Amino acid sequence: MEKVLVFGHKNPDTDAICSAIAYAELKKELGMNAEPVRLGEISGETQFALDYFKVEGPRFVETVASEVDNVILVDHNERQQSANDIESVRVLEVIDHHRIANFETSDPIYYRCEPVGCTATILNKMYKENGVTIRKEVAGLMLSAIISDSLLFKSPTCTEQDVAAARELAQIAGVDADNYGLEMLKAGADLSGKTMEQLISLDAKEFQMGNAKVEIAQVNAVDTNDVLVHQAELEKVISAVVEEKGLDLFLFVVTDILTNDSVGLAIGKAANVVEKAYNVSLENNTATLKGVVSRKKQIVPVLTEAFQA
């Protein structure tokens, strides 16, 4: 049987990795020869989850067409966030919870996108719909994805469906969602030992906003100053990325997991759009973004609107 690769976006977060594992497992149970892979390094937060539930991380690939003809995308749909040669393969399915942009296919496909906080929430439904029991380890990974995407249920992207799914999955996994979740988020907020290049690419995504090419990277921290003490070095590596990719804006967002506020570091010729979007003034290229924790709901649509205004 021909193999199908299942993967999340480049610079994968916990949902991208864990949903690839969970959906590949469901597809295997349903008779498909599916393998989860990843398009980037595994973060400290994700590694904590994998270690805790004793699951091996997926192997790394940059391109897929040399291996398979068909792929399944989870936690993304935009071409620039996917495998480098995504145009050379057929996308069979997409399971996602983001905006739909820069995506088209030549054939009809199974496309499931729901306005929930996490792909794993959708997968929890799909396991039930197909009558497949979720293994304890996989339930733990799916729970980890929901906790990560919802910042332990505090993000505005978090829905009642996400909370309900997390409670169900925690029961299967045999953990207390709140205690485990805080441990996991703290592991993810430990940025010690990371280079500046790693910091700005840990969780970075490119977007087309009107005519502007924008990259938004986000890291979580227990204290934003722990990251911003390196601002001069960060600006240097960000400026290099802006030049290399021809970006109009690179927004580096440092989110405080205790206060649920963020600080944005904006570099690029369109940095002023951040000021317009949030009604703030950039001082030394930074501004506090009060109550902003979600790239998907509080940054991408706000900036997109500002660029198109």
UniProtKB/Swiss-Prot annotation:
UniProt cross-references to HAMAP family, sorted A to Z: PPase_C
Location of the protein in the cell: Cytoplasm
Keywords, alphabetical: Cytoplasm, Hydrolase, Manganese, Metal-binding
Name of this chain's protein: Probable manganese-dependent inorganic pyrophosphatase
The organism's taxonomic lineage, starting at the top: Bacteria, Bacillati, Bacillota, Bacilli, Bacillales
EC number: 3.6.1.1
Annotated cofactor note: Binds 2 manganese ions per subunit.
Any one Gene Ontology molecular-function term assigned to this protein's record: manganese ion binding
Reaction(s) catalysed by this chain's protein: diphosphate + H2O = 2 phosphate + H(+)
NCBIfam families recorded: PRK05427.1
Cofactor(s) this protein requires: Mn(2+)
Enzyme class: hydrolase
Keyword Metal-binding among UniProt keywords: yes
Entry similarity comment: Belongs to the PPase class C family.
CC per GO annotation: cytoplasm
